[in-house]
Every structure is written in structure tokens, then in C-alpha cells.
Design a protein with these regions (language model features):
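ATP/NTP phosphate-donor binding region
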Residues: 25-103, 285
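Short Gly/Thr/Asp-enriched flexible loops that form oxyanion-binding sites at enzyme active sites
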Residues: 115-137, 279-288
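Bacterial N-terminal signal peptides
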Residues: 8-18
Length: 356
């Protein structure tokens, strides 16, 4: 009996030590929080080859279950912020997301954030977070072009790589990142370029920040624009962002679109201009009238790459316009909304476009 009792005690001690060792090993892993917002990565279709699907149909727990080995990279917790297709992403959700990220990253035990997001408006949310997050810890957005039920779905590996980037110390201080199909992009430069191809995101002006392969990363570029902790924008007490409209320029553009935007309460207007941010004479005159009424007019371009220069084809000084520099229309809108949270001159807003 005594021998059996001693054996029992030894086994109990060994089991306890094993549990402590396992717990210690678990604690050594970085702590990552995945914030889910919906999108194709959480989408589901009736069959594996069906193009039509329902966005945001899969929960964060189900997504994690579909990624073997992901929990070997980090201790992962998941939260559902929203569950929408990104065409339905709202400014309210963006504000909620940014505030939650700031709250989580203020906790010493949280090492990084991964946000699952639809690709349609991912670049807008990424750029917003790049200006609103107040931490150098990694924040990584990830999505997919194929739903979770598709043959050769791209979401699981994208999510694995995103967590791999989030746990990498070399990701810190680079601003908000986007990981899609082995590529690591900075929030300032990336844009969606294809409606269907899985390699849809490109960074045409500044190039990739790095590459990721099965959780292994190679960084070779650092974002050159002001972001996160160096950003002057504070959304901690912001509940609503000013209305800013985007108007698309085209041959024989109807100038009354600009007048209608002003009449409906826009505080700012971004023109997705032709070429170097240009528009026809009637629209230029309407935009000048809007600027005279205190509406901030930003000239961007509908062209995928290139910069919009100040006083190049349009006399911005005379018309009191802002040139978007490198920002495409959708990102110019994000920056302008944040700029309008407090009174600024047109010159001050122009400097923001040279900074962010």
C-alpha cells in the first residue's frame, strides 16, 4: 500500500510539473487578439465553385479552426467587432475598431492585433487606422478574395501569415500593415487593383513593405509617411466624422453634382479627377464656388498611380484647393475627414497631405 501511495504521489507531482511546463510554454508565446469585421474571408457559398456567396457568415472561431498550426504561433483571442461585407463598412465601425485597438494595445500583455476585413474597402480602414492607432505594436489587416467554402480558398493561409507578421518584432513601428497572398503592404500605399484576382492588392508608388511565407517574414521597406504614434489625430472622444463626398470626373462632367454635394451638407469634397486631378471648366467653377463657401475641395485622380501636383494644371492657390499628392480619392477622403475635426486653413490641410 505504501509503495502504491508513493507511486501515486510521484505521478501526481510529474503531472503537475508537466502542466506547469505546458503553461509556461504557452505564456512564452506572444498574445494576439484577432478582431473580426466580416468580409469574404468570413464568407460562405452553397458550393465550392459558386461565385456568389454571403459575406460575414463565418465566425472568428470557425475561421481559426480552419487554420492548422495557427495556435502554435501565438496565444490567440478573438472578438467580433462586426460581421458585414466591407461594402457595408461604416465610419461608426471604423471608430469603434480604432478605439478598441487602442484600448487593447494599451494593455502590456497584448502584443499585437490582427483585423479580418473585406477587401473592397480594406485600404480605407487600413489608412484610417494608420492615422488613428496610438501604438507601435503591430496592427495587421487581412482578408481574402475567395470565400471560406471555395475550392483553394486563400483565407486560411492569409490569416496564418497575418498572425505570423503580427508576432514578428520587426513589424513594430511600421504603421498599420496589410497581409495578402504572401505580400506585406503599408497602409499608405496599397490599393485594390482587381475585382477577382487573389493578388489584387498592389503598392504601386512605394512598393511592398515585405513578404511573408508560412509565418516567415522578410522586411525590406519601411513606410516613409507619418503614422500611428506620430499622428496628430486623436479620435478617443470622436463620435462622428464630418461628411466628405467623392465625385468622379469624366468627359462633359455635370457641374451640378458639386452644387448638390454642398447643398446636402458636405464639409469637404474630393474630386477623383482626370489625369493630374483635373476636371472640365464648368466643374472647376463649381468647385471654386464650393471653396468660397468654406467647403474644402481636394483634387485627387481617378488614375491608379501617380501623384497630383499642386498648381500644375490647376491654379490651386487662386481657387483655394488642396492637391492630394500621393493619396487616391478614397484615402484622401479619410485624411480630409480627420483634418476637418478642428478648424484649419487650406494651407494647413495641404501640409497634412504632404505629411500623411
Amino acid at each position: 500500500m505504501k509503495a502504491n501511495h508513493r507511486i501515486f504521489l510521484v505521478l501526481t507531482i510529474l503531472i503537475a510539473l508537466g502542466c506547469e511546463h505546458s503553461a509556461a510554454q504557452e505564456k512564452k508565446l506572444p498574445n494576439i487578439v484577432i478582431l473580426a469585421t466580416g468580409g469574404t474571408i468570413a464568407g460562405a457559398a452553397a458550393t465550392g465553385t459558386q461565385a456568389a456567396y454571403t459575406s460575414g457568415a463565418v465566425t472568428i472561431d470557425a475561421m481559426l479552426a480552419a487554420v492548422p498550426g495557427i495556435k502554435d504561433l501565438a496565444n490567440i483571442k478573438g472578438e467580433q467587432i462586426s460581421n458585414v461585407g466591407s461594402q457595408d463598412m461604416t465610419l461608426d465601425i471604423m471608430l469603434t475598431l480604432a478605439k478598441r485597438i487602442n484600448g487593447l494595445l494599451a494593455q502590456p500583455e497584448v502584443d499585437g492585433i490582427v483585423v479580418t476585413h473585406g477587401t473592397d474597402t480594406m485600404e480605407e480602414t487600413a489608412f484610417f487606422l494608420n492615422l488613428a492607432v496610438k501604438s507601435e505594436k503591430p496592427v495587421v489587416l487581412v482578408g481574402s478574395m475567395r470565400p471560406s467554402t471555395a475550392v483553394s480558398a486563400d483565407g486560411p493561409l492569409n490569416l496564418f501569415d497575418a498572425v505570423g507578421v503580427a508576432v514578428d518584432p520587426n513589424s513594430a513601428g511600421r504603421g498599420v500593415l496589410v497581409v495578402m497572398n504572401d505580400w506585406i503592404h503599408g497602409a499608405h500605399s496599397l490599393t485594390k487593383t482587381s475585382t477577382t484576382a487573389i493578388q489584387t492588392f498592389m503598392s504601386p508608388l512605394r512598393g511592398l513593405v515585405g513578404v511573408s511565407s508560412y509565418g516567415k517574414n522578410d522586411f525590406y521597406n519601411r513606410p516613409q509617411w507619418t503614422h500611428t504614434t506620430a499622428s496628430e489625430f486623436d479620435i478617443s472622444n470622436v463620435t462622428r466624422l464630418p461628411r466628405v463626398d467623392i465625385l468622379y470626373a469624366y468627359a462633359d462632367m455635370a457641374a451640378d453634382l458639386i452644387d448638390a454635394s454642398v447643398a446636402n451638407g458636405a464639409h469637404g469634397i474630393v474630386i477623383a479627377g482626370v489625369g493630374n486631378g483635373n476636371m472640365n471648366k464648368a466643374s472647376l467653377e463649381a468647385a471654386a464656388r464650393a471653396a468660397q463657401k468654406g467647403v474644402v475641395v481636394v483634387r485627387s485622380s481617378r488614375v491608379v498611380t501617380g501623384t497630383v501636383g499642386r498648381n500644375v494644371e490647376v491654379n490651386d492657390d487662386q481657387m483655394n484647393f488642396v492637391a492630394s499628392d500621393e493619396l487616391n480619392p478614397q484615402k484622401a477622403r479619410i485624411l480630409l475627414m480627420l483634418a476637418l475635426l478642428k478648424p484649419r486653413t487650406t494651407g494647413e490641410i495641404q501640409n497634412l497631405f504632404y505629411t500623411y
